[in-house]
Amino acid sequence: KPYSWRSKYGWTAFCGPVGPRGRDSCGKCLRVTNTGTGANTIVRIVDQCSNGGLDLDVGVFNRIDTDGRGYQQGHLIVNYQFVDCGNELDLTKPLLSILDAP
C-alpha cells in the first residue's frame, strides 16, 4: 500500500471477539475510545494478535491515554467500533476490550 494509505491512521493488531478475523480484518478501521476519559481516535488494523483484544501502536495508546492511567496500570479499557475508512465494513455496535500498556 502507498505511504498515504499507511500513514492516514495509527495502527493496531486486532483479535477482538466480534468482527472479521485474520486477513479479512486487515485494512479495516476502528474508532477506539478510552472508557475512562472518552478520548478516541481511529486506527487501521494491520496485524492480528492473540490476546483477545487490540494491540495499539505506542502513538495511538498515548493519544487516548490522556490521564496517564493506562500507562500506570499497564493497560487501557476501551470500546471499539468498526468505522468506514474507505472499506465496505460498517458495524455500528461498540465492543469492549482491555489493552496492555506498550
UniProtKB/Swiss-Prot annotation:
InterPro entries (alphabetical): Barwin_CS, Barwin_dom, PR4, RlpA-like_sf
Molecular function per GO: RNA nuclease activity
Alphabetical list of SUPFAM superfamilies matching this protein: Barwin-like endoglucanases
Induction (UniProt): By wounding.
Disulfide cysteine pairs (residue numbers): C15-C49, C29-C85
Keyword ATP-binding belongs to the record: no
One of the GO biological process terms: defense response to fungus
One Pfam family hit: Barwin
Keywords noted in UniProt: Disulfide bond
Domain of life of the source: Eukaryota
Database matches in PANTHER family: CHITINASE (PTHR46351:SF19), WOUND-INDUCED PROTEIN WIN2 (PTHR46351)
Entry protein name: Wound-induced protein
Record gene name: WIN
